[in-house]
Swiss-Prot record:
Gene3D superfamilies: Cytochrome P450. SUPFAM superfamilies: Cytochrome P450. Pathway: Secondary metabolite biosynthesis; terpenoid biosynthesis. The lineage of its organism: Eukaryota, Fungi, Dikarya, Ascomycota, Pezizomycotina. It is a single-pass membrane protein. This is Cytochrome P450 monooxygenase AOL_s00215g280.
Length: 501
């Protein structure tokens, strides 16, 4: 009898799974939405496309499915993906009733950060404490610091050229943005630019961490590695070892900043930690714990480093492979930077129409945060623009990549074309509305002003000061997998000799 019971248990579980699959495919409220049956049955359909055997391919499979099935496809037991521009500004807008999905944001770690906060009231308090810091007026005060980083970085590029070494541009650009954003965050840089090959641990770690999120989402238990003794975990995962190094580095920077702050030694430019250490009772903001400060700062560094580095890298590659674009941009830069070592105010760079067009097109073409950012359908459900009803609690999202490469919004979207941003303003109304690299609404990227300053400064001085030439790099190398951020299939290298005039 006991043996029979043991046999019936697994059989019963199998029957349950079969019944669950039948319900999800044919009787679930989302069963009217087309999509793969495997996606309707299990969220591991996404893992199949993102981890193995396809690696970072779910975004592109969803793109294909939209081509077959139309504006809305089912990509999980309780999730649909929408590719209808009419819906974008409803889903992602100020005052939106759509909440972030707590389960999705557990993947990120840093639970006390603003990015991971799903409660709209708490999110408003936390974001409100930082909004003034990230305002345009505040970011303009960072200009001397940003320019100092560019000067140092430029000298390192020249050193590589003199040593006969082509520069790995992805890591070089991410090293620069790393030192910019960590100085803004911690009051002092991580020193990524000083690494001889631009392969410092922080740069590699943030890149590897973001690329590991597909695995963490599918198999949350892997986060238990962080709780293992260090001497064991380091042999299982190199990322754990780098993570411990980052923890120590961050703790050291935070402790150093707090000690100086308490002794009245404050930086002469705005910093994230400085703002977090300043309570605001009127807005309900209290100074976070040390862990809360670290969560906030590390999340901001992670979000701001790779995306800006990737955008500038993709834009630079496209410019270098299009001589007409390159020559026109260089000629425009020379109008306000007449000498190789000339310096112009950031607000003057912003006024350059062709530079602005190149940066806008880089933001569109790179789509560095390409994937969907899902939300939960609010109580009462919603109707899509085509009239279909989506019940409350459904996870729903739209990918920025599919917006930016929609031919109805951006004609010839696979062509890098700065000219599209130089037409009559009336013609560009739709394009400007749907250029959404920072998302939109209450949850839009808070660092947009900092990112713009970095992009203008990097692009202007890199192209004006250095005679850039590709080294063993083709368009094939710039193809990518969607690993939360793009992971490129090859390496973009360039010669970075200093111009003589």
């Amino acid at each position: 009898m006991f043996a029979l019971s043991l046999l019936l248990l697994p059989l019963g579980y199998i029957v349950y799974l079969i019944g669950l699959a039948v319900y999800r495919i044919w009787f679930h409220p989302l069963s009217k939405f087309p999509g793969p049956k495997a996606a309707a049955v299990s969220e591991y359909w996404e893992a199949w496309w993102n981890i193995w055997p396809h690696k970072g391919g779910c975004l592109f499979e969803v793109e294909r499915l939209h081509g077959v099935h139309g504006a809305a496809v089912r990509m999980g037991p309780n999730e649909i993906h929408v590719n209808d521009p009419r819906y974008y500004h409803e889903l992602y807008r100020l005052g939106s009733r759509y909440y972030k999905d707590p389960e999705m944001h557990k993947v990120l770690g840093a639970p006390s950060s603003t990015v991971a906060e799903t409660d709209p009231v708490l999110h408003k308090i936390r974001r409100g404490a930082l909004e003034q810091l990230f305002s345009r007026q505040s970011i303009l005060k960072l200009e001397p610091m940003i320019m100092g980083k560019v000067e140092r970085w430029s000298s390192k590029l020249e050193e590589h050229f003199q040593a006969g070494k082509p520069v790995p541009m992805e890591f070089a650009l991410k090293s620069l943005t790393m030192d910019m954003v960590t100085t803004f965050a911690f009051g002092q840089e991580f020193g990524a630019v000083e690494d001889p090959g631009f392969m410092s641990i922080p740069v590699r770690l943030f890149r590897n961490y973001l690329m590991s999120l597909h695995v963490i989402k599918a198999f949350p238990f892997v986060k238990l590695l962080q709780g293992l003794p260090y001497f064991i975990a380091r042999h299982i995962s190199p990322t754990v070892e780098m993570g411990r190094h980052l923890e120590d580095l961050s703790d050291g920077h935070i402790n150093s900043f707090v000690d100086k702050w308490q002794n009245g030694d404050k930086p002469n430019f705005p910093t994230v930690i400085g703002r977090l250490l300043t309570p605001n009772e009127d807005k309900g903001f209290q100074v976070p714990s040390k862990q809360g400060i670290k969560d906030e700062v590390i999340t901001l560094v992670s979000a701001g480093n790779d995306t800006t580095g990737i955008t500038s890298m993709v834009g630079l590659f496209q410019i270098l492979t299009n001589p007409k674009i390159y020559d026109r941009l260089l000629a425009e830069l020379k109008t306000i930077l007449p000498k190789v070592d000339s310096v112009a105010p950031y607000q003057e760079l912003e006024k350059l129409p062709y530079l602005t067009a190149c940066i806008k097109e880089s933001l569109r073409y790179a789509s560095a945060a390409a994937s969907r950012t899902p939300r939960l359908v609010p109580p009462g459900g919603i109707y899509l623009p085509d009239g279909r009803f989506v019940p409350a609690g459904t996870r729903i999202g739209m990918a920025i990549y599919l917006i930016h490469f929609n031919p109805d919004l951006f004609p010839n979207p696979r062509v890098f074309d700065p000219e599209r941003w130089l037409r009559d303003p009336a013609e560009m109304t739709v394009q400007n509305k749907f250029l959404v690299p920072f998302s939109k609404g209450t949850r839009a990227c808070i660092g947009i002003n900092l990112a713009h300053m970095e992009l203008y400064t990097i692009m202007a001085y890199l192209i004006r000061r250095h005679d850039l030439k590709l080294y063993n790099t083709t368009a094939k190398d710039m193809e990518w997998w969607d690993m939360v951020i793009p992971e490129f299939k090859g390496t973009f290298k360039a010669w970075t000799g200093k111009r003589t005039e």
